[in-house]
Amino acid sequence: MKVLGIESSCDDCCAAIVENGNTILSNIKLSQKEHKKYYGIVPEIASRLHTEFIMYVCQQAIISAQINISEIDLIAVTSQPGLIGSLIVGVNFAKGLSIALKKPLICIDHILGHLYAPLLNHTIEYPFLSLVLSGGHTILAKQNNFDDIEILGRTLDDACGEAFDKIAKHYKMGFPGGPNIEKLAIDGNQYAFNFPITIFDKKENRYDFSYSGLKTACIHQLEKFKNNNAQITNNNIAASFQRAAFENLIIPIKRAIKDTNIKKLIISGGVASNLYLREKIKNLEIETYYPPIDLCTDNAAMIAGIGYLMYLKYGASSIETNANSRIENYKYTKGVKL
């Protein structure tokens, strides 16, 4: 079964053709450079550019896969969560294509896509622990199956990737923040600044994360530089922030490993491409799996892949399904299964 995947939940306009859930025939992505001067995503600009590009990326996905449009068996599209304007463009285009081609439609949760991404290039036996690290989400979960996912912990404020973007904006390191901070950190001293690490000891929060304190402390350091007319050392700031940001993750992960006795971990989302993080995770001495670098960030291959499995088990979505910026049928809270 050949699945056309469409992903437009934020600023990346993506389309892919995936066969039988794991054979990627094509994977096309257009990133919107227009947001760089704003040091962040401007929703109105994002949705307008999706309108301009979505037909093109779908055409390129079909051409690159060397198939005819009539060979598409299923259309999978991200319908939640994300920027509502961007989601609407993708969902409405997918609906129109579904009607025109008389092909079934399956609407997919963006987080389920990220959770599935490592399975596109790895065969991993369930159960395993999953960590999603992106600009919008920081979630630690236990996966018993592709559709049986128990949330153990989540960020209580900023997402990990969001914190990287905000620090990069304040220090004018460029956008997106993650890759730029990682690059600057290479030539920095990670112990130059002792930024705080937030760990929760209460039972109900033992797997949770927080980045607001770290973000605030890092921004306050910038004010200290200015007040003292001191030279701003972006390399040291980047290295110290990056170290603290990832140490924030380690203790909740260690707790989950101990409590569940699961020795396998998959990590996905844009932040998963960070090489410093991967070195830190190696110290856990457990089986760890990542998607290829191009599948860490938003992409349509992961949507097509999980869409195939969801369709086989649950059938097609209603053509009346609408885009949702947030989740209506469940919340990202501890103990809730997706």
From Swiss-Prot:
Binds 1 Fe(2+) ion per subunit. Signal peptide: none annotated. One of its GO terms (molecular function) is iron ion binding. Substrate binds at residues 132-136, 165, 178, 274. It catalyses: L-threonylcarbamoyladenylate + adenosine(37) in tRNA = N(6)-L-threonylcarbamoyladenosine(37) in tRNA + AMP + H(+). It is an enzyme of class 2 (transferase). One of its GO terms (cellular component) is cytoplasm. InterPro entries: ATPase_NBD, Gcp-like_dom, KAE1/TsaD, Peptidase_M22_CS, TsaD. GO terms for biological process: tRNA threonylcarbamoyladenosine modification. It holds the Pfam family TsaD. Its EC number is 2.3.1.234. The keyword Transit peptide does not apply. Its main location: cytoplasm. Keywords: Acyltransferase, Cytoplasm, Iron, Metal-binding, Transferase, tRNA processing. Fe cation binds at residues 110, 114, 298. Its cofactor is Fe(2+). It is found in: Cytoplasm. Required for the formation of a threonylcarbamoyl group on adenosine at position 37 (t(6)A37) in tRNAs that read codons beginning with adenine. Is involved in the transfer of the threonylcarbamoyl moiety of threonylcarbamoyl-AMP (TC-AMP) to the N6 group of A37, together with TsaE and TsaB. TsaD likely plays a direct catalytic role in this reaction. Belongs to the KAE1 / TsaD family. PANTHER family: TRNA N6-ADENOSINE THREONYLCARBAMOYLTRANSFERASE, TRNA N6-ADENOSINE THREONYLCARBAMOYLTRANSFERASE, MITOCHONDRIAL. NCBIfam families: gcp_kae1, T6A_TsaD_YgjD. This is tRNA N6-adenosine threonylcarbamoyltransferase.
